Curated annotation (Swiss-Prot):
Gene Ontology terms: biological process: photosynthetic electron transport in photosystem II
Similarity field: Belongs to the PsbB/PsbC family. PsbB subfamily.
TM ranges: 21-36, 101-115, 140-156, 203-218, 237-252, 457-472
Source species of the chain: Trieres chinensis (Marine centric diatom)
Protein name, entry field: Photosystem II CP47 reaction center protein
Subunit details: PSII is composed of 1 copy each of membrane proteins PsbA, PsbB, PsbC, PsbD, PsbE, PsbF, PsbH, PsbI, PsbJ, PsbK, PsbL, PsbM, PsbT, PsbX, PsbY, PsbZ, Psb30/Ycf12, at least 3 peripheral proteins of the oxygen-evolving complex and a large number of cofactors. It forms dimeric complexes.
InterPro entries: PS_antenna-like, PS_II_antenna-like_sf, PSII_PsbB
Organism lineage string: Eukaryota, Sar, Stramenopiles, Ochrophyta, Bacillariophyta
S-adenosyl-L-methionine listed as a keyword: no
Cofactor note: Binds multiple chlorophylls. PSII binds additional chlorophylls, carotenoids and specific lipids.
Length: 509
């Protein structure tokens, strides 16, 4: 009998040996993809400028996840932080990628073995000789092992007790590096931006999982609960597993999009809310004001701003600016950033300082408007010059640059002032190389946007998968046919009212 494509998994429904085989093959595919993708990214990655051309600008997807776990060095002699390294060993990008590919090959061979040798004594009930799995016991084993792994990650890897630690950075993503993290056991551990919570929660969840696993290994479920939740049905396992996966996908979609200690901006790029709230702009202004209050000139104050911090304050790095269906890395949009030109300050002929109103995230075009400190519009680039009152030419706007490549330079000609006013709409002003990658000028999203979009969609699909398989396993007896007790109810002439047990007729002799 031929099976339609959506029914092919029926063949492993009552075949534990081959159920293991297909799971091993799935693990082989996942590990093989991860290792191969890492090697591909390493082949195209340019490590020369970690400040203005970081991995998230280049569209790296696997590398940020490797880096946040403590992998920073390459066999090519470079490091994510820009330093040169020698003999990084196995704990390197290439070493971990190759170990995944080797694991993939081993799982592939194991899958073939289990497919061929599917009928093992292990899978048969010794009392009946029938294929049978003790699913509650298997659940306990898995829970115990995953708890052990969770505890080990939190207690050893993250804390640096036996491992490198994780990627930790400051609130503005400037000073990040891999370092050991002490667990935060207080209320502060629940702050999503506190890396100490990662260590504490893995330790706590791991201990809980270990004890829960031991409980399920030693305590049998009550018969009523066993039957109510269909604990003997393999499709119950599928349904609950899908629930765990879609829940994890929903949670990580949130931590990725809104930001968290687990998704540092140095590795995944800034969040859209940091642009929306002027997060970096406010910090830059605070640092400049502090420097000026210390006696530095405005030019010196702006020169102290790190290029890395200024680059975050640019709309092209906002993951919400790139359309979801614009393929390619951010660098294919606006180009490869080469230099910060500095902070432009505009002035009209009366000497008033003017600020260009910044473009909101969801606008493709936005009027160029220059306002004074009170928010009053003093200049603009008009749509119709014939009716203009506040044009750059009429108001006599000039622009001075502080910090960056154009530090100390002043521009007075209207075309140049307009050019920089348009650039200032997008945040801090940068120089881009658009020829090397044939960049088209259309913004792209960062790996942060792609991850969120993908996992939110997968979570939704898996949610429906959970409902589907949960419904199938709970109502299995209804779907598989009519039971013996139902036959009497619907027998013609047995009841005055069909199917109503209270109207049973007296049998004639």
């Amino acid at each position: 009998m031929a099976l339609p494509w959506y029914r092919v998994h029926t063949v492993v429904l009552n075949d534990p040996g081959r159920l293991i085989a297909v799971h091993l093959m799935h693990t082989a595919l996942v590990a093989g993809w991860a290792g191969s993708m890492a090697l591909y990214e390493l082949a195209v990655f340019d490590p020369s400028d970690p400040v203005l051309n970081p991995m998230w600008r280049q569209g790296m997807f696997v590398m940020p996840f490797m880096t946040r776990l403590g992998i920073t060095d390459s066999w090519g002699g470079w490091s994510i932080t820009g330093e040169s390294v020698s003999n990084p060993g196995i704990w390197s990008f290439e070493g971990v990628a190759l170990s995944h590919i080797i694991l993939s090959g081993m799982c592939f061979l194991a899958a073939i073995w289990h497919w061929v040798y599917w009928d093992l004594e292990l899978f048969r009930d010794p009392r009946t000789g029938e294929p049978a799995l003790d699913l509650p016991k298997i659940f306990g084993i898995h829970l115990f092992l995953s708890g052990l792994l969770c505890f080990g990650f939190g207690a050893f890897h993250v804390t640096g007790l036996f491992g490198p630690g994780i990627w930790v950075s400051d609130a503005y993503g400037v000073t990040g590096k891999v370092q050991p993290v002490a667990p935060a056991w207080g209320a502060d551990g629940f702050n999503p931006f506190n890396p100490g919570g990662i260590a504490a929660h893995h330790i706590a969840a791991g201990i809980f999982g270990i004890f829960a696993g031991i409980f399920h290994l030693t305590v049998r479920p009550p018969q009523r609960l066993y039957r109510a939740l269909r604990m003997g049905n393999i499709e119950t396992v599928l349904s609950s597993s899908i629930a765990a996966v879609f829940f994890a996908a929903f949670v990580t979609s949130g931590t990725m999009w809104y930001g968290a200690a687990a998704t540092p901006i140095e590795l995944f790029g800034p969040t859209r809310y940091q642009w929306d709230s002027g997060y970096f702009q406010q910090e830059i202004e605070r640092q400049v004001e502090t420097s000026v209050s210390e006696g530095l000139s405005e030019s010196q104050a702006w020169s102290r701003i790190p290029d890395k911090l200024a680059f975050y304050d640019y709309i092209g790095n906002n993951p919400a600016k790139g359309g979801l269906f614009r393929a390619g890395p951010m660098n294919k949009g606006d180009g490869i950033a080469e230099a910060w030109l500095g902070h432009p300050i505009f002035r009209d002929k009366d000497g008033r300082e003017l600020t260009v109103r910044r473009m909101p995230a969801f606008f493709e075009t936005f009027p160029v408007i220059l306002v004074d400190k009170d928010g009053i519009i003093r200049a603009d680039i008009p749509f119709r010059r014939a009716e203009s009152k506040y044009s750059i030419e009429q108001v006599g706007v000039t622009v001075d640059f502080y910090g960056g490549k154009l530090n100390g330079q002043t521009f007075k000609d209207a075309p140049t002032v307009k050019k920089f006013a348009r650039k200032a709409q997008l945040g801090e002003v940068f120089e881009f190389d658009r020829t090397s990658l044939e960049s088209d000028g259309v913004f792209r999203s960062s790996p942060r946007g792609w991850y969120t979009f993908g996992h939110a969609n997968f979570a939704l699909l898996f949610f429906f998968g959970h409902l589907w398989h949960g419904g199938r396993t709970i109502f299995r007896d209804v779907f598989t046919g009519i039971g013996a007790e139902v036959t009497e109810q619907v027998e013609f002439g047995a009841f005055q009212k069909l199917g109503d047990k209270s109207t049973k007729k007296q049998g004639a002799v």
